[in-house]
Amino acid sequence: MNNSEQLRAIEFENIELTTIIQRLENGQYAIPVFQRDFVWDKSNIRDLWDSIYRHYPIGSFLIWETDEQLPRHRNILNIELKENSKGKFNYVLDGQQRITSIIGAVKGAKRNRTSFKLFFNISKAYEMSKKDLLDQISNSPFLTEKELKDSSSSDQVLPLEKLLDFDSAIYRNLSQINYDLSDYYLTISEKFRKDYKVSV
């Protein structure tokens, strides 16, 4: 393969959501300023995470690797991002709304007093897993912050970031409350952290 063919080569890899988040945070991925502003609302974000939970495809991300350093966004939804100052630069060309939604929900981002933090109703998800497919489709185990405040349910609800960053304290607390829920938590945590992959 000659040099110009190498420059045009298209490659892909399947990576975990946690890897995408880490690469954004540490500056390996950047969103160039020529991308449109973030326009999704909380329901779009919840629907994206619901698709991930159900293992539906959410499309691939197009990342452009180049030696050229371009102007980039230094924060996403008020989440400060590190800058990669050396080596190759990787810019998100397609998938910016989805990537922003993923990191915004996990990090509990806020913009203009709007919270993008999501919560996972593990009790509801566990009950849904025992029902038929039609019942599962019409329900979502994800809640926005407002929906959580408006809810009078005593279900076990966890911030989304706790599913991606396994916390044994949460597992121990759940196991004291309900063994089935704690076992299901392990399954769901693994599903979000390792089983679901996206092509970049």
Language model: regions and residue ranges:
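Basic- and aromatic-enriched surface patches that contact anionic nucleotides/nucleic acids
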Residues: 2-39, 46-200
